[in-house]
């Protein structure tokens, strides 16, 4: 997966005083992920964060020579540096989105902010390429007051190639195999360059209502072989 991510054609976007560079991205039949790196366009020092209210990381606090208990806003005020809040997403279409996504902002060893996001895909809606929309937003804040000063947004439509499925295997289980009351009909394994995805088809007991309790049982189910 890392080799595929690193093979990304890097692109840069000017968003206010920052340059957001698409360092890594990939998509297969199950997930789409991207990593944007944020830095000031003129290379001047600044505090770039994903959330201005959170504490600064231990590594970044050590690099800057400040107390790790300080919030990012307090660090910017203490060091008299501009404060920017970043959000950088590679969004997929609603039809291709399986309904779950994640995002996080982390600092690399050089102190640059990396904004990562991942979306789970609906396999039946994925073709040879995946339409995406880059949503890139930067907000500047006054560290002393917490007031938002300016807000910049850049949006762009694009497409990225889909990694092909390399192999697929369906495991049919003996009748009567169950987990948490759900009968296991089959387990399918799909192999991509990014890894192996397992999908189980489960049959709910007759008359079972798919309420919150039932869904909790479903999500806590586990299927293991004789070796665990």
Residue ranges and their predicted role:
Residues 1-228:
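Alpha-helical, hydrophobic structural elements that either
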